[in-house]
Amino acid sequence: MTTNKSSLSYFTDALWINNQPLVAILGICSALAVTTTVTTALTMGLAVSFVTGFASFVVSLLRKITPESVRMIAQLIIISLFVILIDQFLKAFFFNISKTLSVFVGLIITNCIVMGRAESMARHISPIPAFLDGLGSGLGYGWVLVCISIIRELFGFGTILGFHIIPKIFYASAAHPDGYENLGLMVLAPSAFFLLGIMVWLVNIVRASKTKR
C-alpha cells in the first residue's frame, strides 16, 4: 500500500473521519454491556486503544516475515498477548472495574476493530503509522462509548462517574410523589443501540451535507 499520508493523518482519520463504530459500524456489540456507566465505558475504550495500537504496531513490524498461510493466526496470537496484558493489569490495579467488566475485557480479541485494523492497515504500512492508526481507531471507538454512557448513566442513575448530577431533592418521594424518576429504559441494553443509531444518523447527515457542498 503506497501512500503519501503523514503519520499523524492516520491517527486523525481513524479518530474522526473513518470512525469505526459510526462510519464502518464495527465494534458495536460491546455498546450493549459496557456503557451503563462512564467508568466502564472509559475503561473499555482505553483498553481497546491499548490493544489496537500495540497489536497493529507488532503486526506491522513482523509483516515482512509473516507467512501468508498463517497471517491471521499470527495476528490473533499478537492480539491475544495484548488482551491478556491489559486484562491482568486491570485485575491487579483496578479490580472492581475489572470485576464489573467481567468477560468483556477478554472478548476484546473478538472485537472487529482490532482485527480489522491489523488486516486492512497494519500489514500494509510501517510500524509508526500502524500504531497511530490503531490508537486512533481505539480512541475513536472509546469516545463513542463514553458519549453513549454519559446519557445512559445520567438519565438511568442520575449520576456521571458516580457523582450525583441530578439533585436528590428533585426525585419523587412520599412528600412529592410527582417528582423526578430515573429513566429505566436507559439501564436496559437496547437503549445503547438506539443512542448509537442516533449518532450514526447524525454523522450521516453531516457527511451528506458536506458532500452536497
From Swiss-Prot:
One of its GO terms (cellular component) is plasma membrane. It comes from the Bacteria. Pfam families: Rnf-Nqr. Keywords: Cell inner membrane, Cell membrane, Ion transport, Membrane, NAD, Sodium, Sodium transport, Translocase, Transmembrane, Transmembrane helix, Transport, Ubiquinone. It is found in: Cell inner membrane. Disulfide bonds: none annotated. GO terms for molecular function: oxidoreductase activity, acting on NAD(P)H, quinone or similar compound as acceptor. The chain crosses the membrane at residues 14-34, 42-62, 77-97, 101-121, 131-151, 154-174, 183-203. GO terms for biological process: sodium ion transport. It is an enzyme of class 7 (translocase). Belongs to the NqrDE/RnfAE family. PANTHER family: ELECTRON TRANSPORT COMPLEX PROTEIN RNFE (PTHR30586), NA(+)-TRANSLOCATING NADH-QUINONE REDUCTASE SUBUNIT D (PTHR30586:SF1). Composed of six subunits; NqrA, NqrB, NqrC, NqrD, NqrE and NqrF. This is Na(+)-translocating NADH-quinone reductase subunit D. It comes from Chlamydia muridarum (strain MoPn / Nigg). The gene is nqrD.
